[in-house]
């Protein structure tokens, strides 16, 4: 009966395979015994005191303390910010707000984050693909000529910088060029989930943020899941002009941010920016050390430049890729196999965990 009633295109659709979903067992003890280096989570846990006052009441639609805290952090007015359940909800809201089912399309630049296509497919939007290209200057950059050929065919264009799973950063010039290309025909979404790993110091100019006031078709996605080490909260932010925020507010659920989430997130954004920055500095240092180590391994043929909290690398062949992956899994160290992604044959991705976790991983792989 369900197959009769369900939307036909969803019956055989493969859902997004999140890192936890791939290795979920339902056994908390087993989960805690594993080293999770496959979801780009930050290591360590914070301690937070919560108030139980008014827990019997629904939270504000958009908690003002949270919006003000993020406003101070990103130097945008509150009217330009929408708090969401992670950046993933922002992706979904954008597609639902701008794309009519079975009429409009989104554009993606693979290899890229899988939820853009999954969310589009769920909504019945078409998917146009313009793959990233390697240039003499850098890997995985935008194909601007390819993008020009798609003007008028897509309503939403997703750019990821730093990219996931590649880790590369798109230049400001490339991002601005893409915005110019689509300024009269599509919204350009710049996913900056890993932005903090590119920022050298607190208070530094946030270049892409300025584009919001310069163009009507710019949306930026941010999250507290990565550098802020709050993946379990599911708290993200969609940044754009007031008209876009007003539109998305018509589509979002009435109570998207739980009161405890807003309370913790507000405290972290107000009091713990220095803690976040120290975490970023540590992760970046470990990333560079791991990248250099990988380059010395006989089974590794390429290490991608990264400005995020992970390293993507390519093995010589599928057999060696499987040996690396399976050896780690056998010892409860989980990394991400990206080899099914376009252009990423035999590629694996390692999240930057703690210093001890990375040392354990290297020690194990040195036995190959």
From Swiss-Prot:
**Required co-factors:** pyridoxal 5'-phosphate
Keyword tags: Amino-acid biosynthesis, Aminotransferase, Histidine biosynthesis, Pyridoxal phosphate, Transferase
Catalysed reaction equations from the record: L-histidinol phosphate + 2-oxoglutarate = 3-(imidazol-4-yl)-2-oxopropyl phosphate + L-glutamate
Task: Write down the EC number.
Answer: 2.6.1.9
Pathway, according to UniProt?
Amino-acid biosynthesis; L-histidine biosynthesis; L-histidine from 5-phospho-alpha-D-ribose 1-diphosphate: step 7/9
Which Gene Ontology BP annotations are present? L-histidine biosynthetic process
UniProt xrefs under Pfam families: Aminotran_1_2
The N6-(pyridoxal phosphate)lysine modification is found at 226
Query: What InterPro entries has UniProt attached to this entry?
Result: Aminotrans_II_pyridoxalP_BS (IPR001917), Aminotransferase_I/II_large (IPR004839), HisP_aminotrans (IPR005861), PyrdxlP-dep_Trfase (IPR015424), PyrdxlP-dep_Trfase_major (IPR015421), PyrdxlP-dep_Trfase_small (IPR015422)
What SUPFAM superfamilies does the record point to? PLP-dependent transferases
From the UniProt record, which GO molecular function terms apply?
Answer: histidinol-phosphate transaminase activity; pyridoxal phosphate binding
Oligomeric and partner information: Homodimer.
HAMAP family named in the record: HisC_aminotrans_2 (MF_01023)
Task: State the similarity comment.
Answer: Belongs to the class-II pyridoxal-phosphate-dependent aminotransferase family. Histidinol-phosphate aminotransferase subfamily.
Q: What is this protein called?
A: Histidinol-phosphate aminotransferase
Recorded source organism is Colwellia psychrerythraea (strain 34H / ATCC BAA-681) (Vibrio psychroerythus)
């Amino acid at each position: 009966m369900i197959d009769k009633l369900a939307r036909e295109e969803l019956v055989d659709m493969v859902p997004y395979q999140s890192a936890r979903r791939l290795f979920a067992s339902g056994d908390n003890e087993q989960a805690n015994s594993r080293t999770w280096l496959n979801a780009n989570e930050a290591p360590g846990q914070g301690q937070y005191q919560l108030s139980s006052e008014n827990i019997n009441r629904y939270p504000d639609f958009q908690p003002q303390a949270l919006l003000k805290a993020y406003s101070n952090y990103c130097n945008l007015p509150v009217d330009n910010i929408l708090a969401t359940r992670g950046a993933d909800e922002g992706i979904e809201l954008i597609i639902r707000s701008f794309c009519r089912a079975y009429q409009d399309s989104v554009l993606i630049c693979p290899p890229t984050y899988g939820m853009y296509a999954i969310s589009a497919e769920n909504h019945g939007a078409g998917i146009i693909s313009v793959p990233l290209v390697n240039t003499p200057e850098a890997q995985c950059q935008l194909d601007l000529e390819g993008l020009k050929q798609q003007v008028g065919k897509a309503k939403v264009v997703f750019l990821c910088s730093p990219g996931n799973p590649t880790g590369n950063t798109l230049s400001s010039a490339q991002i601005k060029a893409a915005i110019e290309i689509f300024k009269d025909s599509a919204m350009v979404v710049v996913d900056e989930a890993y932005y903090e790993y590119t920022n050298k110091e607190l208070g530094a100019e946030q270049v892409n943020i300025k584009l919001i006031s310069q163009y009507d078709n710019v949306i930026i996605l941010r999250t507290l899941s990565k550098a802020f080490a709050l993946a379990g909260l599911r708290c993200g932010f969609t940044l754009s002009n007031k008209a876009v925020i007003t539109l998305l507010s018509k589509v979002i659920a009435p109570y998207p941010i739980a009161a405890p989430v807003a309370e913790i997130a507000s405290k972290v954004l107000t009091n713990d920016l220095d803690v976040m920055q120290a975490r970023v500095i540590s992760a970046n240092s470990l990333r560079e050390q791991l990248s250099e180590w990988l380059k010395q391994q006989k089974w590794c043929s390429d290490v991608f430049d990264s400005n995020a909290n992970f390293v993507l690398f390519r093995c010589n062949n599928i057999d060696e890729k499987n040996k690396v992956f399976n050896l780690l899994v056998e010892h409860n160290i989980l990394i991400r196999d990206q080899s099914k992604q376009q252009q990423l044959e035999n590629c694996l991705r390692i999240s930057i965990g703690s210093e001890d976790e990375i040392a354990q991983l290297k020690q194990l792989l040195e036995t190959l």
